[in-house]
Each structure stands twice: as C-alpha cells, then as structure tokens.
C-alpha cells in the first residue's frame, strides 16, 4: 500500500494489511500499537521522531533518524503489516538518499512475557548521489529513565558493566574484530519495565549518550537520556549502498538480565545485512 497524506475524512482509516494482532492498527502514514497502558506510534513523514512510546505522563521516543528538516524530502513509503518503510532525500551538500524500515514484534521479544513486551527494529540504508560525500547518520533514542546499565555480548558470553549510570556523558567506539553487540538497558520510571537498545559492532561507527535531570518528569529520580548511535563512514562514494540496524526491546525489569542476554545473543548470530 502506497503512503498518502491523510485528509480529515480518512484519519481513522485502517489499511488492508493490518497485522494479525488486534493491538496493531495501521493507516496510510504509519501505525499505532498498544500494550496495556503503553501506546507506540510511528509517522513516516516524521522520521526524526521514530517510534513514540507513551504511557500516562511519560513519553519516550526510539529509533528516530537524525535528518536535517530544512533539506529533507519524503519521497515515498508504504505499510505492510507490522513493517513501515520510508524513502527520504536530503537536498543539501551531502545529497544522501536514505531509507528506514521500522519493524514491530520481531524475533527479539522476551518469550516469557510477550503480552507485556515490545520489540522494534530499524534497518537504515543510505547512499549518495555525489562522487564522494559525508555518509554519517545518527539514530536517536530519547528516554526518561532512572538509570542505565551497559553490557556487551562477545565470543558467546554477555558482560555487564558493574556500575549503573545516572547523570553522564558517555562515548564508545566500535573496535572489536569479531561481531560484538552492545546493550544499553534503561530502567523506566512509573512502571517496572526496562527498555534495552542493541547495536552490532560491524554495523555501527560509534555511540554517544548524555543525560540531564528530567525536570518535566513526575518521577523525582528520573533523568532524560539521549542516546545517539552513528552509522556509516564519514566518506562514502556514489553507487555504494551502506546499511545498518538497531534493535530496541521493552520487557519486564525482573527478568531483564535473561532477555537482554538472549536478545544480544540472537542479534549477534544474525548474518550481515550486506555480504
């Protein structure tokens, strides 16, 4: 189904490719998914917003593509079940042609509590129309969370960093010779769930995370975290396609160590996107 702008007469229309789950409803611009009190929404015309997660007074966003709004053109898009694809052009000096495929409820979901869990994956693709260009793109996640803990899956084992992070400025660069998966597990306020973000060392360049006190939060111990994952080289050539992916999983905090390890292990064993 092709994407078209919604008019006031069809804002409640659902597509003929609804996912099998009753909680997932799509229209001509994106979809809405509900899990208990949590609502996840995606609008393909706003790739920078990614997937918004709202529950009560708490609002977070995951898997937003950082594209310059003043030079951004939304060229095309479509919805197929729980997958949404958007095609974008940047009409600036970089002349990038970028696509994002957002997918809900993939193979990463915690199986022991699937009704209260959510999995989202973004596959990011980009190339340039110039002979050479800066190809770096960031995917942004913005959370209100109490703490974040980092961990890494490498050589068949998962290692958690011993200390959790609160107010911080965090930077990491991919340097592993084998495929490693980095995990950022955010403890969300107001309900007992953890949101974990996973990236692969062979597809990501570096990650930057900052945090400040969340003044607008109803939880006094909450912080606002901004996680930016940077993909693709700073110099790319015309005719060469670059592709990377990032996964976010929402699951119960009481079993986060188990399902984070399982998700990281499964993600590490996936074949490369470009071979």
Regions found by a protein language model. Give the residues of each.
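Acidic (Asp/Glu-rich), glycine- and aromatic
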Residues: 113-167
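Extended, loop-rich substrate-binding clefts of extracytoplasmic carbohydrate-active enzymes
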Residues: 25, 29, 36-38, 47, ...
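Preference for solvent-exposed, low-hydrophobicity sequence contexts
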Residues: 12-21
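Beta-strand elements of well-folded, non-transmembrane domains
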Residues: 108, 124-130, 141-147, 233-235, ...
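Low-complexity, serine/threonine/proline-enriched polar segments
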Residues: 156-190
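Hydrophobic residues positioned within well-ordered beta-strands of beta-sheet architectures
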Residues: 104-106, 118-122, 227, 244
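Intrinsically disordered, low-structural-confidence terminal and linker regions
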Residues: 1-10
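Beta-strand-rich recognition/accessory modules
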Residues: 180-275
């Amino acid at each position: 189904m092709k994407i078209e702008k919604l008019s006031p007469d069809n804002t409640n229309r659902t597509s003929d490719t609804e996912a099998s789950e009753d909680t997932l409803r799509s229209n001509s611009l994106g979809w809405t998914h509900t899990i208990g009190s949590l609502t996840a929404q995606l609008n393909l015309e706003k790739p920078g917003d990614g997937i918004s997660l709202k529950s009560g007074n708490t609002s977070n966003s995951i898997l937003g593509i950082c594209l310059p709004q003043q030079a951004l053109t939304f060229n095309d898009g479509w919805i197929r079940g729980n997958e949404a694809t958007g095609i974008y052009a940047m009409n600036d000096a970089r002349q990038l042609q970028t696509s994002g495929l957002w997918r809900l409820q993939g193979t990463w979901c915690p199986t022991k509590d699937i009704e209260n869990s959510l999995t989202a994956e973004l596959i990011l693709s980009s190339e340039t129309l110039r002979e050479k260009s800066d190809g770096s793109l960031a995917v942004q996640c913005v959370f209100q969370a109490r703490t974040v803990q980092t961990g890494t899956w490498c050589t068949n084992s998962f290692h958690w960093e011993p200390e959790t992070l609160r107010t911080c400025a965090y930077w990491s660069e991919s340097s592993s010779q084998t495929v490693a998966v980095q995990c950022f597990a955010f403890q969300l306020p107001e309900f007992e769930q953890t949101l974990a973000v996973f990236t692969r060392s062979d597809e990501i360049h570096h990650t930057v995370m900052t945090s400040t006190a969340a003044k607008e939060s109803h939880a006094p111990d909450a912080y606002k975290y901004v996680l930016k994952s940077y993909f693709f080289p700073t110099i790319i050539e015309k005719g060469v396609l670059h592709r990377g992916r990032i996964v976010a999983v929402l699951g119960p905090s009481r079993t986060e160590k188990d399902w984070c390890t399982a998700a990281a292990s499964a993600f590490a064993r996936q074949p490369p996107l470009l071979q």
